[in-house]
């Protein structure tokens, strides 16, 4: 098994606490409203805390698909949220697990910087596919910007 680590940052005009609330606390409600392709977010196991497994159902290529997302840690005081993709179409056959460690920090002019460390654990001696990695980054960036756009369009959300 190989472990490959990548880091990325995204900036937002939305304040960290407000963005965190939308991305973590109210995610099950906000994400389907903000991200056009996501149909639903539902808890399939757990109580919403660490260990909880959520099912994100979305449309891709005209088909309904899903990904299973396991909450690893929630750190509201430090605006941190860690989760893993543990099943569904987001987990290719060569990948054991994809983990995300996220944190929001103060950015310029009252905005935020979203920092993420992605760890890909492969099965056997498989290597991560570079094109899949680029596509995953593009999806993550689009997701982050969709939430930002939703919050900008709904200034009363708190």
Swiss-Prot record:
Localization terms from the record: Cytoplasm, Cytosol
Keywords assigned: Allergen, Calcium, Cytoplasm, Hydrolase, Metal-binding, Nuclease, Pathogenesis-related protein, Plant defense
Binding site for trans-zeatin 3: 69, 81
Chief location: cytoplasm
Keyword Repeat applies: no
Residues that, per the record, bind trans-zeatin 2: 60
GO molecular function, one term: abscisic acid binding
Known EC number: 3.1.27.-
Binding site for Ca(2+): 32, 35, 38
GO biological process: abscisic acid-activated signaling pathway; defense response
A GO cellular-component term linked to this record: nucleus
Binding sites annotated in the UniProt record for trans-zeatin 1: 8, 83
Pfam families assigned: Bet_v_1 (PF00407)
Function according to Swiss-Prot or TrEMBL: Class II ribonuclease (RNase). Binds to cytokinins. Interacts with melatonin.
The family this protein is said to belong to: Belongs to the BetVI family.
Name by which UniProt lists this protein: Class 10 plant pathogenesis-related protein 2C
Organism: Lupinus luteus
